[in-house]
Amino acid sequence: MGAQSKYAQQLNNERSLAPFIPFRSQVGPTTVITRDGDFVRTWRIAGLAFETQDKEKLLIRKDQLNTLFRAIASNNVALWSHNVRRRTWDHLKSFFSNPFCDALDKKYYGSFSGYRMMSNELYLTVIYRPVPAKISRLFNVAVHRSHAEILQEQQLAIRKLDEIGNQIETSLRRYGGDDGRGIEVLSTYEDKHGALCSQQLEFYNFLLSGEWQKVRVPSCPLDEYLGTGWVYAGTETIEIRTANATRYARGIDFKDYANHTEPGILNGLMYSDYEYVITQSFSFMTKRDGKEFLTRQKQRLQNTEDGSASQIMEMDIAIDQLGRGDFVMGEYHYSLLVFAEDMETVRHNTSHAMNILQDNGFLATVIATATDAAFYAQLPCNWRYRPRVAGLTSLNFAGLSCFHNFRAGKRDGNPWGQALTLLKTPSGQPAYLNFHYSKGDEDNFDKKLLGNTRIIGQSGAGKTVLMNFCLAQAQKYLHNAPMGMCNVFFDKDQGAKGTILAIGGKYLAIRNGEPTGFNPFQMEPTAGNILFLEKLVQVLVSRDGQHVTTTDESRISHAIRTVMRMRPELRRLSTVLQNVTEGSDRQDRENSVAKRLAKWCFDDGTGKRGTFWWVLDCPQDQIDFNTHSNYGFDGTDFLDNADVRTPISMYLLHRMELAIDGRRFIYWMDEAWKWVDDEAFSEFANNKQLTIRKQNGLGVFATQMPSSLLNSKVASALVQQVATEIYLPNPKADYHEYTDGFKVTNEEFDIIRSMSEESRMFLVKQGHHSMICRLELNGFDDELAILSGSSDNNELLDQVIAEVGDDPSVWLPVFQERRKARIASSKSTGR
């Protein structure tokens, strides 16, 4: 070699990798055969999301895994499992026509720069050994066999491997999402050039080189083909060189084991910020060999007087359990190879990993003897290179290799395309947030699936920011939407005002006594709209418990149909009043429709304004979903006004219903319980929760008062008809509200209560699976001034827009400048 490593003196010279590679050829799409005639197959396992799983369920899964191992146990069978933690990177594709959304998106994904995004990948390899004993192998090789006999034996072995594989796939398919696709066999495939490639060989090559790359199925022996790097082994350190990089690795194994191996005992490593490969192998013993091993262990304890009476008794119990078939015995080995780009970092990472292992009761040590052997023992079938082989029960193995992983959500193939956004997690695993819940690797694009989402979070936990951030990110779904997209936000305390206006939307704060900007009679004069107007006016004239007669209905209908034939600028409630005929007798006139309707009109017929004219009798209607695709309505005032709440709700919901026409549609409700307290909204929410998915829409509901939501008129619909649940930290969470009301598990409830309110973490749940995510917006002061919806910023925003207009590209810079000046002035005053 020309260039010498900085540490070349302490590293051995280069050696060919071929002697250390046991594989000979690929004999089928999913099967590799070794030089010794063993048949090898590997699966990728999604893994069991352990972070939010109840401990009892994890123990059940461990027992089920032990049952699987017992079912496939034979001295012809061995297992290799791998946990690969590696650095990854991702960025969701987004296109925003709105400058605020575009800038927020770019800055948000820019904040991932320097962030250690990691992924954990789990693999299980099964080896079927037709002739497991070494002497038998030599005898088998010595016997001359015809090509037909060899082929027949190979087919028999593959069939046996198929049987074992079917058992494994049946048992482990639940180790992933709800779709039963938790396991996937590594197979051959054709690349775009038509060349046959192998995922299985790519994995084995990764174990040798540390790099993922396409590997074609060769015609030459695999041991001469695999391995695209150079491996140098020193006393404690291995250097791996490839054409792209040089990396260093150090190995760790166990000198002694923890007393108990509950499932997930090694999970602490999965939160580390460095790359590693954990390799574990388990070669099944016969029952006789297993019993002999345990008996020898018992005798050793007795002879050396190292064992206590309880330890000897435990050995007796183990021998009895083995005899009953509670577990099987096997030869086990463990190695952890930690990687880094330089020697100093790999030492630091190794020290960190050892501390984690020792904290869990293992006596871990750096591999200093035959370090290359530990490296090559990563490859399945390399029995002779395994360091520190120990006898272990299948129950212990099920605890050590329990296939735990993190939930990640679904990146692609969602009903509206890619995931809504990418979130950070405690483990570094990328988490993909979606409204819709769609299963596994299915391509559900344009499918009408349930997407209703519920957000629960107490004041100060970040609920408003999260909702507004999701609203801004959802604007990307407008791009390439065949029929467009619309968002309607039913707000409380104007929390979404800044965001709605910044994304180019229209925001109407409905205040008691002030014109709402609503004029229902300027809608298109369609049959459906006219029927709605008739119903609306009937509600107006019956608000005081007044009865609407058949004659009243006829007069209302006549007046409305007359007005709706006029030009739009003439159509309004006052004009309807002018066209309502009164009765002939005095009693009828005193309680006429006209007199009851007058209080809702700008002109009550005598030149005076009615008490509630400001509600629905404005000269120009301000709602037009053709000019704005985002609307916000603040209900803080009117939701507590029983006189006007229902008519306003009816009109808002009718206009929204007209916009639900197949375009992508989201309606948002902050403090949803307050909105659905009105009869019109409760009826709408109850129906729409069930049907809106068929219309390509969804609802997002939020509250900081779970009890109010659970006690609402439509609680069952708001709880049951939900695809995605988001729970922000709440140290005061009520157990019964969350577990009985929202059906979170005990473990999920504990997480919700224990998360720090300042952590910006939250729990996302879809189906029976959940994950812990974090929306990190450090350094986003300008954006948070919009997303947080604070009262002082809203007041400033109103002032700026009144001066410079409602174009976000104009008012946003002025708003930020004045906001910062206000903060600076406040600081100087406080000094």
Swiss-Prot record:
Ligand binding (ATP): 457-464
Family label: Belongs to the TrbE/VirB4 family.
PANTHER family named among the record's database cross-references: TYPE IV SECRETION SYSTEM PROTEIN CAGE, UNCHARACTERIZED PROTEIN YJGR-RELATED
UniProt keyword list: ATP-binding, Nucleotide-binding, Virulence
Pfam families reported in the protein's UniProt record: CagE_TrbE_VirB, P-loop_TraG
Function: The virB operon is essential for intracellular survival and is not involved in the invasion process. Constitutes a major determinant of virulence in mice.
Signal peptide: none
Species annotation: Brucella abortus (strain 2308)
Classification via InterPro entries: CagE_TrbE_VirB (IPR004346), CagE_TrbE_VirB_cntrl_dom (IPR018145), P-loop_NTPase (IPR027417), P-loop_TraG (IPR043964), T4SS_component (IPR051162)
One annotated GO molecular function: ATP binding
The keyword Electron transport appears for this protein: no
Name listed for the protein in its UniProt record: Type IV secretion system protein virB4
Cited SUPFAM superfamilies: P-loop containing nucleoside triphosphate hydrolases (SSF52540)
Additional note from the record: Transcription is turned on at the beginning of the stationary phase of vegetative growth.
